[in-house]
Amino acid sequence: MRIAMWSGPRNLSTALMYAFGNRADFAVVDEPFYAAYLTQSGLDHPLRSEVLADQPNDPADVIAAMLAPLPKASPHVYHKHMTQHMTAGIPREWMRDVVNVFLIRHPARVVASFAAKFENPSLEDLGFVQQAELYDYVPVSYTHLTLPTKQA
C-alpha cells in the first residue's frame, strides 16, 4: 500500500509521519516534492541548498521514485506531502495510483500556529487553496482506510 498523506503546514503532520515510521511494515518519505517546489518557486527557505542537494529537483524523478517497487522489508510506504509544494508545474496523474489521505486541522489553529512564526500568511502559504484543489482532483474511492494487521 502506498499512502500519500496531504497536509498543509502546522497540521501536526510530522508527528503522524513518525507514528507510521515506527511501524516495521512501513517505509516513510518526508516531503518528496520539496526540492522540486524550491526549484520551481525560487523561494529561499531554510536549508534550501541542503534540500536541493539531497532530493531530486525534477518532479518526474520524484514520481518515479514514489511509484518504484517497494522493498520486501517494507511492504507499505507513507509519503508525507505538503499541499503547497504541488505547484502548477507538478503532474498529478500519479495520485490515482496511491491511497490519498487528507490531514485537516481546524483552520484557526493552523493560522495561529503559522502566524506565530511567519508574518501575514496567505491562504497559499497555508496550503488551503492547494489542498482543496488536490481533494477535488482525487477520485473518491475509499471511505476509510484500514491498515493491515499482523496475523497471529
List PLM regions with ranges.
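Glycine-rich phosphate-binding loop used to anchor ATP phosphates in small-molecule kinases
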Residues: A68-A88
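PAPS-dependent sulfotransferase catalytic core
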Residues: M1-K72
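Conserved small/polar residues in nucleotide/adenosyl-binding loops
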Residues: T143-T149
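A structural motif corresponding to the C-terminal end of an alpha-helix
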Residues: L134-Y142
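Conserved phosphate-donor/acceptor-positioning beta-strand/loop module used by diverse small-molecule
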Residues: D97-S113
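Active-site glycine-rich loop that binds ribose-phosphate moieties when present
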Residues: G127-L134
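Short, solvent-exposed loop/turn segments at secondary-structure junctions
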Residues: R10-N11, F33-A35, T83-M86, P107-V110, ...
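Surface-exposed cleft-lining segments at the edges of enzyme active sites
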Residues: S113-E124
